[in-house]
């Protein structure tokens, strides 16, 4: 269930309440940022102001630029904007800050913390443990698609007897053994 609804039966209702940011996006070669944002906004009943979101994520000056011409970090921030256009109650973010420099990563984190404080639920997939520590209230560690730990960062560290979350993650996921 998502937001108390069966996704198989209430797909259209949930579509209006959920945002998704994919790690990679494949769009028309020449589509401009503004065109993609307008097209995305047209799918929702009450979309957010895409221009304001672009400004908030530091790509406000890129509206007339073709998506293919954006840097990797700019493209990643655009994908976050697209996920937030529906003004979702729940957003799925896949490898959120891949391709962002340290300053841009921190800026995205700060913005997401603000959205979280306003009640947005964020479901984050990440291989950056510092990002998980900074953003996640609850975590679920998977090993070959199966949950091996669910709880808080602190609980993971305690369970493994580790001082650092990254060490607990490696132990729980057996990634260190696979290397």
Language model region names:
Residues 80:
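Hydrophobic anchor residue at the start of the ABC signature
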Residues 150-151:
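ABC ATPase "signature
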Residues 91-94:
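Catalytic Walker B motif of ABC-type/P-loop ATPase nucleotide-binding domains
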């Amino acid at each position: 269930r998502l937001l108390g609804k069966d996704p198989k039966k209430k797909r259209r209702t949930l579509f209006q309440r959920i945002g998704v940011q994919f790690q990679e996006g494949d769009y028309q070669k020449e589509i401009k940022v503004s065109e993609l944002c307008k097209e995305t906004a047209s799918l929702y009943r009450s979309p957010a102001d895409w221009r304001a979101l672009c400004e908030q994520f530091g790509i406000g000056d890129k509206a007339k630029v073709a998506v293919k011409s954006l840097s990797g970090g700019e493209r990643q921030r655009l994908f976050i904007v697209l996920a937030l256009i529906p003004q979702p109650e729940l957003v799925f973010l896949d490898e959120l800050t891949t391709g962002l420099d340290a300053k841009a990563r921190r800026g995205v984190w700060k913005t997401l913390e603000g959205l979280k404080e306003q009640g947005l639920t964020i479901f984050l997939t990440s291989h950056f443990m510092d990002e998980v520590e900074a953003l996640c209230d609850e975590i679920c560690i998977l090993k070959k698609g199966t949950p091996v730990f669910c709880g808080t960062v602190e609980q993971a560290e305690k369970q493994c007897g580790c001082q650092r979350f990254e060490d607990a993650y490696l132990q729980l996921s057996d990634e260190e053994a696979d290397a």
